[in-house]
From Swiss-Prot:
K(+) binds at D116. It is found in: Cytoplasm. This is Type III pantothenate kinase. It comes from Bacteroides fragilis (strain ATCC 25285 / DSM 2151 / CCUG 4856 / JCM 11019 / LMG 10263 / NCTC 9343 / Onslow / VPI 2553 / EN-2). Its cofactor is NH4(+); K(+). The keyword Cytoplasm applies. It catalyses: (R)-pantothenate + ATP = (R)-4'-phosphopantothenate + ADP + H(+).
């Protein structure tokens, strides 16, 4: 079994893979991996990968250093099954690269746009030759809602869920519709622009936020909430024998 530890900005995910098939995923705190010991005792773990976008505290570091299996710590020097053309690989978030790796692994030989809608919204492009060209970073849903409240004098902090007319009928619905529809139009705009350059483009959508697209757009999107975990597992398998 492969142990995949994905430590993000808000939560940590601990997943188990049997070769390429995900068996279980547990959501945990990124400040203390309380589920780690139970997961390791439950499965026959042979190797692990750790990927983090935050600085780990002493508690989490101690837990990870006690793992009784070889551990691959993902960094900018880790060999990857794609060609990384990013000019500053040391600044590239592991989650961005892992999502690209997973998408390319599923559809090698295809031009792919990977959209990850989480704390931030990222747009990544990998071409049919397996070359990762880079991507863009945009504020995520909660970040936009919070910014409107934090950087203005009177706008309230609005929850993402709730009534959302085409045009806001009050301040709350104006903010909700403005932010959520703005994100949807942003995403559809990226897809349209990329498909103009790459007519056979495939699109993957992952991340914690869910958006409603029209039926035509849904037909060109592969939605996969666990794309990053699958990519980390692919990277771990690719480095088998190096750890």
């Amino acid at each position: 079994m492969n142990l995949i530890i994905d430590i993000g900005n808000t939560v940590a995910k601990v997943a188990l893979f049997d070769r390429t098939s995900m068996v279980e995923v547990v959501y945990d705190s990124n400040q203390s991996l309380d589920s780690l010991e139970a997961v390791c005792n439950k499965y026959d773990v042979r190797k692990a990968i750790v990927a983090t976008v935050i600085d780990l505290n002493e508690c989490v570091l101690a837990q990870l250093n006690k793992l009784p299996v070889p551990v691959l710590w993902l960094d900018s020097h880790t060999p990857l099954p794609v060609i990384n053309l990013y000019e500053t690989p040391e600044t590239l978030g592991y989650d961005r690269m892992a999502a690209v790796v997973a998408a390319h692994d599923q559809f090698p030989g295809k031009d792919i746009l990977v959209i990850d809608a989480g704390t931030c919204i990222t747009y990544e492009f990998v071409d049919s030759l397996g070359q990762y060209h880079g991507g863009n970073i945009s504020p995520g849903l909660w970040m936009r809602l919070k910014a409107l409240h934090q950087f203005t004098g009177r706008l309230p902090l609005v929850h993402a869920e709730g009534r959302m007319p085409d045009m806001g009928k009050d301040t709350e619905t104006a903010i909700r519709a403005g932010v959520k529809k703005g994100i949807e139009y942003e995403i559809t705009g990226y897809i349209a622009a990329m498909k103009h350059k790459y007519p056979e483009l495939l699109v993957f959508l992952t991340g914690g936020d869910d958006f409603s697209f029209d039926t035509k757009l849904k037909s060109v999107i592969f939605a996969d909430r666990f794309l990053v975990l699958k990519g980390l597992n692919r990277i771990l398998n690719y480095n088998n024998g190096r750890i």
